[in-house]
UniProtKB/Swiss-Prot annotation:
Coiled-coil spans in chain: 328-493, 536-632, 808-832, 861-1171, 1235-1291
Organism: Actinobacillus pleuropneumoniae serotype 5b (strain L20)
Protein name: Chromosome partition protein MukB
Keyword annotations from UniProtKB, A to Z: ATP-binding, Cell cycle, Cell division, Chromosome partition, Coiled coil, Cytoplasm, DNA condensation, DNA-binding, Nucleotide-binding
Matches recorded under NCBIfam families: PRK04863.1
Main localization of the protein described in the UniProt heading: cytoplasm
Residue sites binding ATP per the record: G63, G64, N65, G66, A67, G68, K69, S70
Length: 1496
């Protein structure tokens, strides 16, 4: 046994003799421990719905065999650990069996249907927690049970568990399935949760303080179940005692994990260094294989792409030629049909045109004959007209002379009457000589006149009053008679001449109308003369009517011509125009169309010339760009790689230069950040190293001094305080927190003078390290710190530190934070170091790019420009081809439009005639009017001269000269009546004139004399005028005779001319044609027009016949060309389709494998096929050598040499790519692209080599530090076990008076610790070896210092990992103090059954308490977990032992559930009497609960 074990024994002896250790800290607030309140069983065997209220200390189930005690405990255990892999409820019938029943003892305890086992607990927070399981038998031979765990929270205290899990159905109750239970609480405050894993269920129970330890794995659950099982069946469990270390000693996962992390980091570091060396050797191979395979495949790839593009272009050209031939053939066939149709139409129209031409020629001859007759007629008509004019002039002159004769005769008669009247007046006025005589005479004459008037008028009552009325009456009669007499005088005055005129007029009338009665001559003459006026008017209109008829006939002919032209136009234009508006609109449209077509045609010609120039320019630009494109693509590839490396999109050369400058700045900043992070990482490593020490001290001299003084660091004594208490104790001791606790200060004082190396301030505290308390200070805790009363006059206030030194939990918590921060800083440092390397590499690439490709990289894409140029060129070619077709089409449209306009120009002037539907009627009407007018004209020509002669003498026909005597008698009678009436008028007027004479009788005599003289003068004048009138009458009569003779000569000449004219008119009437102005021109124009049309038709027919022959020959040629073009196109298309299938496979392979951008090297597209084959062949030779050692790549390369399957080359490239990708070390290079991997290798290799070398030095584990950590951990756990022993001091069962745990360090491991601490130089070969890990070195050292131990088949690594666990250094045993034997190892064979049960229960209580302490850091501060153990068959304990258990439960605040026979009735706790009964064939357990009667 080592010194350490002896020290432990001494400490144990001292502990037994010392008082109990005071608590480490007095908590300010007491937290109550959680308790199990009840157990509810639903539908179990004997328990349909039973709730057992659990006592706060001991609950006893009392009953006979088969009463249901084990069933109740099984329900509790099942609800606590619902793991079917662990549950195994044994009974006494299986005492000697090696295996239990299939159902693990659970199937038979359940009834059919839904069953529940539910635990109700009340935790430290006062929360009601309901946890349980739903069980259900599964039908089958295996007797399986289905278990579902669940929990309920926020259930009111008033709700019982049974009411929750069942519902009342009439007088019976129904157990709710789990789904209905869930639905029952949906939408309510009650939280129902079903668990699909046991780990989640136990995590919930741990968080709420139902179980003492977090059960993270099945191993933890197994330990917990074994603990329960050992408690249930009692005794000292060998399973637990043999593995007591696993139950009592917590696993120091932090330390072991730290060792493992360091070791794995070192291992990974060394592996990475090896991988770097391998990668360095792979880099050249990567470059060579990638370069050659890329050249080999991409050259063939681009050659196939070029050939495919060329084949497609050839196919397109052949298809275009095929379509052009097809369209030409269709066009020629259409022309053949149109020309054939036109020839047929011309043949049909030719015969009708010939007939029309002959008819027009005959009509022209008739018109010319008619015109010759018309000229003669016009000449005779002119002569007759001149003679008629002369006759009319002579007749007018004769009439004027006749009028002069009549006027002269009337003047002579008037002159005679005036002379006679003046003579009678003068005779009357000679009778008055003087005035009186005259007055008297006048008076007498007035009276006489009045009497005379009375006598003449027969008016005896005549007087001065009514004389005027009678005068007016007789004056009117005198006027009528005067007119009558004047007429008769006129008739009588011309009676001699009238007789001659009558005879002549009668003769003329008889010539015109034939023989008629003389008495009817006047009426006939008057009617002839009346009609003659209209006839002359009609005769004058004959010329106009003839012109009008000619115009109408011309217009009618034009209308017929227009209808014919319109029909031809509609036929040619495929229209149905009828109205003028439609034709005019179409004319304007066609005229506009003609202008547009002409403008468009001119524009086409100009544009075509411009396009040809553009095509030449584009060809020059294309050739220039084609020369530049390969270099541009190379620059673009470099730019793409540069942008991919930089992660930046460069838009211009300035951006590249700016990025270079930014990269330099970024490199400087990254270097500074890297150095700063390196310093931070070193500081964190130092801090982590310090906190990783067991005592948390940053001064190693304190540990040495503590060992020298035989004391313990104060921080080690408080290493087990909780996270919450650690700040308090750190503040409580202040600067003395680094003190050393020694047993005797006086013994240490002597050694202080001998110290040569110690801290500036060294604090020493006297006390027992194994029983130390904090009674040194008087302290008061505040909100943010602690006030410590050092003395009456000195207080110290210390704030709670953020990182307390005390408490392993607090240090580990902060250590986790520091490690996370260290890892983060380390990662940042690696990132910054990588950034520095990357910046340097990028700057190098940027410099190369600027020097080589900058001038071209940012130029516009020549391929895009070439595509644009090619598109423009293609577009220009297409436009030129289309322009040629369009030009031909436009010229055709132009000719068509011109022809249409030419026809429309002929039609439009006649368009008004088309709508004149009355033209034919008006022509007929005009022809009828012309016939009438010509008849009148003929009548005027024949009888106009007679009527002209008749007109002036027609009045002579009124009186026949044979009645002259009667006329003369009538004249005399009228004269006598006139004279008589004049006498009466004269007598009355004389009375009226003499009215004044009745009033006076005298007058002045001088007046009469003057009147006489006046009358004499007037008489002389009248006589002179009479002589003059007689002379004028004689002259007029002589002139009348002369004019009459001239008129007779002219009339005879006119009659001869008129007779000749009538003969000519009859001849022209026989011809049936009217010759007028323009008739010959119209007839000749009509004939010439028909002749021209006939000539044009014949010429057109001859041209069409020639064209038909040419077109038929052209159709034959085009048919042969079309067949050949179709065959060539289909052949080429099959070639394209075959190439497309292969090309699609190539594209599919390249795109699916993401290698298309590697193969599609556009700079190779401008090289010829021979050049590309040369590149591919050179690369093939290099690849054959490169892949000679790789069978897979060699076979793939051999398959790729088949030129008929280009996809095999892509498959080879993919194989190479995949092969290289698999060779990439992902732990070094973060990419799967071999191209990028090469680039990243350049960046990573140098950085990783330096960094990993320095990292390996940092990660090196010190053997001395490992030994120190293990010693401190072992010492801490020994102290903890000593504290646990205090709880077992007063335990007594039978002869056993005490129980304790003994911890010893194994000798072999103690030797190992000494070797680690002291043999640094001796065992340097193991720990400095690069080939051995620290675990392996530790295992080799263990073997070296313990050569007698056999390692077996285990590896050094496994042994080394076990040696890093402090639990393997300790032996833990249970000892009992029994009678005279003293302390001895606890074994069942040396103890009675009751003593073994009590001892085992004590051990289990220690385990539970240890678990609580272990899990205290992971549990909430306000939670103390429930403590409950089981004990079946408690009858083997006597009353004293039972009371001891009760006392132990009370002291440890633990609940106990025991099963006892009926004769056991504890005085304390709660007892349930269970009796199984059968009623009405139904078995059930009758339960009666009793409170302990001894309880106060």
């Amino acid at each position: 046994m080592t010194d350490t074990n002896e020290l432990f024994e001494d400490q144990t002896t001292a502990l037994q003799n010392s008082a109990p250790i005071a608590p480490l800290a007095n908590p300010q607030h007491t937290v109550s421990r959680g308790k199990f309140r009840s157990l509810t069983l639903i539908n179990w065997n004997g328990f349909f719905a039973r709730t057992f209220d659990l006592d706060e200390l001991v609950t006893t189930l009392s009953g006979g065999n088969g009463a249901g005690k084990s069933t109740t405990m099984a329900g509790f255990v099942t609800a606590l650990i619902p793991d079917l892999t662990l549950l195994n409820f044994r009974n006494t019938t299986e005492a000697g069996s090696t295996s239990s029943s299939r159902d693990k003892g659970l199937y038979g305890k359940l009834k059919a249907g839904v069953c529940y086992a539910v635990l109700e607990s009340l935790n430290s927070r006062g929360q009601r927690v309901i946890t349980g399981v739903r069980l259900q038998q599964v039908a089958g031979r295996d007797k399986k049970v289905d278990i579902r765990s669940f929990s309920l929270q926020n259930v009111p205290m008033s709700d019982s568990i049974i009411s929750i899990l069942t519902e009342q159905v009439g007088e019976k109750a129904r157990v709710l399935p789990l789904a209905d239970l869930k639905d029952k609480f949906d939408g309510s405050e009650v939280l129902f949760k079903q668990y699909h894993s046991i780990t989640d269920y136990h995590s919930f129970m741990f968080d709420l303080g139902v179980i003492p330890k977090r059960l993270r794995s099945s191993a933890d659950r197994s330990k917990f179940y074994k603990l329960i099982e050992a408690s249930l069946y009692g005794g000292i469990s060998s399973v637990i005692t043999k593995s007591l270390r696993d139950y009592l000693l917590p696993e120091n996962t932090g330390v072991r994990q730290a060792f493992q992390d360091m070791e794995s980091a070192l291992r990974e570091n060394r592996m990475t260094l090896e991988a770097i060396k391998v990668t360095q050797s792979d880099r050249d191979m990567f470059k060579r294989l990638i370069t050659e395979s890329t050249n080999y495949v991409s050259a063939d790839y681009m050659r196939n792409a070029n050939e495919r593009r060329g084949n497609v272009q050839i196919a397109l050209e052949q298809r275009r030629a095929w379509y052009e031939s097809k369209s030409k053939l269709e066009l020629e066939q259409q022309r053949l049909i149109e020309f054939s149709r036109e020839v047929a139409d011309i043949s049909e129209n030719e015969s009708s045109l010939e007939a029309e031409y002959n008819s027009a020629n005959d009509h022209l001859n008739l018109v010319m004959n008619a015109l010759r007759h018309q000229e003669k007629i016009e000449r005779y008509q002119n002569e007759v007209a001149e003679l008629n004019e002369k006759l009319e002039e002579q007749q007018i002159a004769l009439e004027e002379v006749s009028e002069q004769v009549e006027t002269a005769q009337a003047r002579a008669d008037d002159a005679d009457d005036q002379v006679e009247e003046l003579r009678s007046q003068m005779a009357d006025y000679q009778q008055a000589l003087d005035a009186q005589q005259t007055r008297a005479l006048q008076y007498q004459q007035a009276i006489a006149a009045l009497e005379k008037a009375k006598q003449l008028c027969g008016l005896p009552h005549l007087d001065l009053h009514n004389v005027e009325d009678y005068h007016a009456e007789f004056a009117a009669q005198a006027d009528d008679l005067t007119d009558q007499v004047f007429e008769l005088e006129q008739r009588l005055s011309v009676s001699d001449m009238a007789k001659t005129q009558f005879e002549k007029a009668y003769e003329l009338v008889c010539k015109i109308s034939g023989e008629i009665d003389r008495s009817e001559a006047w009426n006939e003459a008057r009617s002839l003369l009346t009609a003659f006026t209209d006839q002359k008017m009609q005769a004058t209109q004959a010329v106009a009517l003839r012109q009008k008829l000619a115009d109408l006939e011309q217009r009618l002919h034009q209308q017929q011509n227009a209808e014919r032209l319109l029909a031809e136009f509609n036929q040619k234009a495929q229209t149905q125009f009828e109205t003028a508006e439609e034709l005019e609109g179409y004319f304007e449209q066609q005229q506009a169309r003609l202008e547009d077509v002409e403008a468009e045609l001119a524009e086409f010609v100009e544009v075509r010339s411009t396009q040809r120039q553009q095509r030449e320019q584009l060809n020059q630009q294309y050739n220039q760009l084609a020369k530049t494109a390969p270099a541009w693509h190379t620059a673009q590839s470099a730019l793409a790689r540069l942008e991919e490396q930089c992660g930046e999109k460069f838009e211009a050369s300035q951006s590249v230069m700016q990025f270079m400058q930014n990269m330099l700045t970024k490199e400087r900043e990254a270097t500074l950040a890297r150095d700063e992070l390196a310093r931070r990482e070193a500081a964190l490593d130092a801090q982590i190293t310090r906190l990783s020490q067991p005592d948390g001290s940053d001064d190693v001299r304190l540990n040495q001094l503590a060992e020298r003084f035989g004391g313990v660091l104060l921080s080690e004594l408080y290493d087990d305080v909780s996270i919450d208490d650690a700040p308090y104790f750190s503040a409580l001791y202040g600067e003395a927190r680094h003190a050393i606790v020694v047993r005797d200060l006086e013994s240490v004082k002597a050694q202080l003078e001998k110290l040569d190396d110690c801290p500036t301030d060294l604090y020493l505290i006297e006390g027992d390290p194994s029983a130390f308390d904090d009674a040194v200070f008087t302290a008061e805790e505040l909100a943010e710190g602690v006030v410590v009363k050092v003395s009456d006059r000195q207080w110290r206030y210390s704030k709670f530190p953020e990182v307390p030194l005390f408490g392993r939990a607090a240090r580990e918590k902060h250590l986790e934070t520091l490690k996370a921060e260290r890892d983060e800083v380390s990662e940042q440092h690696a990132e910054r170091a990588f950034d520095v390397q990357k910046c340097q590499r990028l700057h190098q690439h940027l410099s190369q790019f600027v020097g080589t490709h900058l001038s071209l990289a940012f130029q516009p894409n020549p391929e895009e420009q070439m595509q644009e140029i090619a598109a423009e060129r293609t577009e220009i070619e297409r436009e030129l081809n289309q322009a040629a077709g369009n030009e031909q089409q436009l010229r055709s449209q132009l000719d068509s439009a011109k022809a249409k306009l030419q026809m429309l120009n002929k039609i439009l002037p006649l368009v008004s005639l088309l709508e004149d539907e009355t033209l034919a009627d008006r022509a007929e009407e005009c022809r009828a009017q012309l016939d009438e007018a010509e008849e009148d004209e003929q009548f005027v020509r024949q009888f106009g001269n007679y009527l002209t002669q008749l007109e002036p003498i027609a009045a002579s026909l009124k009186s026949d000269p044979a009645k002259f005597e009667q006329l003369e008698q009538d004249y005399r009678q009228a004269k006598a009546e006139q004279k008589q009436v004049q006498q009466k008028v004269f007598a009355l007027s004389d009375v009226i004139q003499r009215r004044v004479h009745f009033s006076y009788e005298e007058a002045i005599g001088s007046e009469g004399s003057a009147l006489t003289e006046q009358l004499r003068t007037r008489l002389e004048n009248a006589q002179r005028e009479r002589e003059q009138a007689r002379d004028q009458l004689r002259q007029a009569q002589a002139q009348f005779t002369q004019y009459n003779q001239v008129l007779t000569g002219l009339r005879s000449s006119c009659d001869a001319k008129t007779q000749m004219l009538q003969e000519l008119i009859r001849e022209i009437d026989d011809l049936g044609v009217r010759g007028d102005i323009g008739a010959e021109e119209r007839a000749r124009s009509r004939r010439d027009e028909l002749q021209q049309r006939l000539s044009q038709q014949r010429s057109r027919k001859g041209y069409l016949d020639k064209q038909l022959g040419t077109i038929e020959a052209e159709i034959d040629n085009l048919t042969r060309t079309l067949r050949k073009a179709e065959r060539d196109y289909h052949t080429q298309r099959e070639l394209v389709v075959q190439a497309k299938v292969s090309w699609c496979l190539v594209l599919k392979l390249s795109r699916n494998s993401d290698v298309e951008k590697r193969l599609n090297r556009r700079e190779l597209a401008y090289q010829s096929a021979e050049e590309l084959r040369s590149i591919s062949d050179k690369a093939l030779g290099a690849l054959r050598t490169a892949v000679a050692d790789n069978e897979y790549l060699r076979d793939s390369l051999r398959a790729s040499e088949d030129s008929r399957k280009p996809e095999n080359k892509v498959a080879f490239f993919i194989a190479v790519y995949q092969h290289l990708r698999e060779r990439i070390r992902q732990d070094i290079i973060k990419t799967d692209d071999p191209i990028d991997a090469i680039e990243q290798m350049e960046i990573e290799l140098s950085r990783l080599t330096n960094e990993l070398t320095s990292r390996e030095k940092k990660l090196a584990i010190s053997a001395e530090s490992v030994a120190n950590i293990l010693r401190k951990t072992i010492q801490r756990e020994q102290n903890r076990i000593l504290q646990l022993n205090q709880g077992l001091q007063n335990i007594a069962f039978g002869q056993v008076k005490g129980v304790r745990l003994v911890v010893n360090i194994r000798d072999t491991h103690a030797i190992l610790l000494n070797a680690l601490s002291n043999g640094r130089e001796e065992h340097k070969d193991l720990f400095d070896s690069q080939k051995l890990s620290f675990s392996e070195a530790l295992a080799m050292l263990y073997k070296r210092v313990n050569p007698h131990i056999e390692m077996g088949q285990r590896t050094p690594q496994t042994i080394g990992e076990e040696l890093l666990d402090y639990r393997n250094y300790l032996d833990l045993e249970v000892e009992t103090f029994r009678g005279a034997d003293g302390w001895m190892r606890a074994e069942s064979s040396a103890l009675s059954t009751g003593e073994a049960i009590g001892t085992g229960m004590s051990i289990l209580l220690m385990v539970v308490q240890s678990w609580e302490e272990e899990s205290r850091r992971m549990r909430a501060k306000d939670i103390l977990p429930s403590r409950l153990l089981f004990l079946d068959e408690a009858a083997r304990l006597d009353a004293t032992s039972i009371n001891t258990l009760f006392e132990l439960c009370e002291r440890l605040d633990m609940q106990l559930l025991i099963a006892a026979p009926e004769n056991i009735s504890p005085e304390r706790g709660t007892t349930y009497k269970l009796v199984r009964k059968i009623t009405n064939n139904q078995e059930y357990v009758h339960v009666v609960g009793l409170k302990g009667f001894g309880q106060q």
